[in-house]
UniProtKB/Swiss-Prot annotation:
<feature type="modified residue" description="N-acetylalanine">
    <location>
        <position position="2"/>
    </location>
</feature>
<keyword id="KW-0378">Hydrolase</keyword>
<dbReference type="InterPro" id="IPR027417">
    <property type="entry name" value="P-loop_NTPase"/>
</dbReference>
<comment type="subunit">
    <text>Interacts with the cytoplasmic tail of integrins ITGA1, ITGA2, ITGA5, ITGA6, ITGA11 and ITGB1; this interaction is dependent upon its GDP/GTP cycle. Interacts with ANKRD27. Interacts (active GTP-bound form) with TMED10; the interaction is indirect and regulates TMED10 abundance and localization at the Golgi.</text>
</comment>
<dbReference type="GO" id="GO:0032482">
    <property type="term" value="P:Rab protein signal transduction"/>
</dbReference>
<feature type="binding site">
    <location>
        <position position="49"/>
    </location>
    <ligand>
        <name>GTP</name>
    </ligand>
</feature>
<feature type="binding site">
    <location>
        <position position="31"/>
    </location>
    <ligand>
        <name>GTP</name>
    </ligand>
</feature>
<protein>
    <recommendedName>
        <fullName>Ras-related protein Rab-21</fullName>
        <ecNumber>3.6.5.2</ecNumber>
    </recommendedName>
</protein>
<dbReference type="GO" id="GO:0003924">
    <property type="term" value="F:GTPase activity"/>
</dbReference>
<dbReference type="GO" id="GO:0050821">
    <property type="term" value="P:protein stabilization"/>
</dbReference>
<keyword id="KW-0449">Lipoprotein</keyword>
<feature type="binding site">
    <location>
        <position position="31"/>
    </location>
    <ligand>
        <name>Mg(2+)</name>
    </ligand>
</feature>
<dbReference type="GO" id="GO:0015031">
    <property type="term" value="P:protein transport"/>
</dbReference>
<feature type="binding site">
    <location>
        <position position="30"/>
    </location>
    <ligand>
        <name>GTP</name>
    </ligand>
</feature>
<dbReference type="GO" id="GO:0005525">
    <property type="term" value="F:GTP binding"/>
</dbReference>
<feature type="propeptide" description="Removed in mature form">
    <location>
        <begin position="221"/>
        <end position="223"/>
    </location>
</feature>
<keyword id="KW-0256">Endoplasmic reticulum</keyword>
Amino acid sequence: MAAAGGGGGGAAGRAYSFKVVLLGEGCVGKTSLVLRYCENKFNDKHITTLQASFLTKKLNIGGKRVNLAIWDTAGQERFHALGPIYYRDSNGAILVYDITDEDSFQKVKNWVKELRKMLGNEICLCIVGNKIDLEKERHVSIQEAESYAESVGAKHYHTSAKQNKGIEELFLDLCKRMIETAQVDERAKGNGSSQPGAARRGVQIIDDEPQAQSSGGGCCSSG
């Protein structure tokens, strides 16, 4: 769900709240990416996520305040059926694979199909090849991964949670894309469009003045 709040400050002063979900197989490093981004922490020991965990991050991008609600989902097969519960109303999805594990890349394709089926083309997709610190053990070709990402309307990124590479760029770019999508929805609403895609994502404009603040949608209220 995305909420854009604006008072008298115009577009530059808008505040946006976005929901981002991380998907991928177990052991690809989803939790490590989130912890590195939100808390600048890294643990060499494998961290198993059970069901889903939730972290928040606040940013300022070109004068626009952004609140991110980041959902880190479990990768184990037995939790896959719970996926729709967590990625419902998401504005962005980060689909992570391990560059040393071809099967984890193939599983990303299944997630893409499911997201497109459930959320359509409005959700911003990022396909991420993690663990580039293990480049010598790579089993997924860069060309194949980038070609696939382009074919499904996603952007491809390379990251290393261990070395803290590519993570800031990943989230910054995703935020910019989600802002652009929200602005398109706002313009469509201003032109009288019924904007079914925006309604499905819960995009709304909120008066940012103190007397008109809404108490709902508190997914980014902590962190």
